[in-house]
Amino acid sequence: IARGLAVKNPQTLLHTDAVQGFLKVPCSAKTLGADFLTISAHKIGGPKGIGALYIGPRVRNPKPLLAGGGQESGLRAGTEATAQIAGFARAVELRQENLEEKLLCMAKIRDYAAERLSAIPDLKILSAPGGAPHILSASLVGWPSQNIVNDLGSQGVCISAGSACHQG
């Protein structure tokens, strides 16, 4: 997307929501072609309600949404959540310890689950082989997703249906 956008309209700035992939898949604002990139602590075991915004060098004079003090280089009014910021930093440190080993373990669990689930009639694995190590997407034709979540939950298996940004 970034390459196509750069060719079609080089002045357009690109925002990338990297929350789900942060410290789980190799990526950077540069490799993604992102002018803005957001990440969040809660997806790596850090506190909820704290995130970070990368603003790239092509962004000239960003304007704050809320006017106020000089926090965050004048881009965000309000008291800085120092405890959450420290918690986010610690979560990053902990996540980076043995990161390759953790990612390999996640991928093995994902692959094992995909192998076991593929034996279920009418179940389709939607995730690409070798994809994100922490995501396994599957669909069971004709079954309401909430019923599957509830049935598996009653057996101690935790899954989710849809996504936080899903509407409807």
Predicted regions mapped to residue ranges:
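Pyridoxal 5′-phosphate
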Residues: 1-168
